[in-house]
Structure formats: structure tokens, C-alpha cells
């Protein structure tokens, strides 16, 4: 049986489910609040709001906590390693040595972009926002790599992720 909290407004009673967060914290699921009551919530700065469920990131700004897949960000500050962090975010764990070597090689091997992509990149004004350029270039990549659009086969995920990440590094 799901635990709930009771909200009473204008003589009506509403049951809102309790959910458990990544770190064991309890939360009230208000996703149906507006539809059922017409009410919204006010939480300045979103200090008491979890915006989504995530298996990737945990943030507690008051406590200064940031974790990726359960690993404190401080671990990556001490030993920053792009390949390890990319693997962790994609696959949910740090890579074994063989996985690291294979993924690292794939990132290097797949870095080249089509010549016309270079022309696209040169066509942007020098004053254009970098993220706007990067977004446009990533969208253009799907014209050359239809496999980026949808990955149905989990066995293909590693190759497609390596190809996309390597090209983003080249563009950036």
C-alpha cells in the first residue's frame, strides 16, 4: 500500500502519494496537484523541489552535495577523466580497464567530421553563442549519421555513444 499525505483545500480532501528519492529522502508527488485541485505550488529557488526522478544526478545544494551515479563530484575533481565520466553517465558504472581502453580508442577513432560539417561551422558568426552553434552542429550530424537518431539495440549503444561524443569533442 502506497503511503500518502492528505491535503485539505476548500472543504475537499486530496491524497497525494509519498515517494522515496535516490538518497532515501521522502517526497510528496504533486504531479497531479494542478489537474485535481487547480492549485500550483510556490517554492522560491526550488530549494524544496525535486524537478525529476534521476538515476544519474543527485543534488543537495544546502549540503553542497553533487553526485553522479552515486559518486561524489569531488572524486572527479581529484582525478578528472573524461572517458571514465562519460562511461559512468552512459552505462551507470565506472568502466573496467578493457571497457575503458575500447571506449577511449573508439572516441579517438571516430573523431573526424565530414568536410561539409566544417563549412557549416565556419558559416556561423564569430559572435554567435557557443551553445547555439554546438546545438546546430549536433542536429546537422544526424544528417550524416542516421544511427544517432534512434538506438534500439543495446549492443550498439557503446559504438553510437562513442561516435557522437567523439564528434562533439571535435566540434567543440
Q: Where are these predicted regions, by residue range?
A:
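Hydrophobic alpha-helical bundle cores within soluble ligand-binding/oligomerization subdomains
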Residues: 2-172
Amino acid at each position: 500500500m502506497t503511503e500518502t499525505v492528505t491535503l485539505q483545500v476548500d472543504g475537499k480532501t486530496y491524497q497525494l502519494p509519498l515517494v522515496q528519492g535516490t538518497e532515501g529522502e521522502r517526497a510528496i508527488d504533486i504531479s497531479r496537484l494542478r489537474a485535481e485541485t487547480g492549485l500550483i505550488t510556490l517554492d522560491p529557488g526550488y530549494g524544496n523541489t525535486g524537478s525529476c526522478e534521476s538515476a544519474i544526478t543527485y543534488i543537495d545544494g544546502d549540503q553542497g552535495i553533487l553526485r553522479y551515479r552515486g559518486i561524489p563530484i569531488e572524486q572527479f575533481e581529484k582525478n578528472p577523466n573524461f572517458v571514465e565520466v562519460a562511461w559512468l553517465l552512459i552505462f551507470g558504472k565506472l568502466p573496467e580497464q578493457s571497457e575503458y581502453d575500447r571506449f577511449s580508442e573508439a572516441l579517438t577513432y571516430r573523431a573526424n567530421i565530414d568536410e561539409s560539417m566544417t563549412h557549416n561551422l565556419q558559416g556561423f558568426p564569430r559572435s554567435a553563442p557557443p551553445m547555439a552553434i554546438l546545438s546546430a552542429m549536433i542536429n546537422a550530424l544526424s544528417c550524416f549519421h542516421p544511427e544517432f537518431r534512434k538506438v534500439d539495440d543495446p549492443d550498439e549503444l557503446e559504438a553510437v555513444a562513442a561516435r557522437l561524443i567523439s564528434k562533439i569533442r571535435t566540434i567543440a
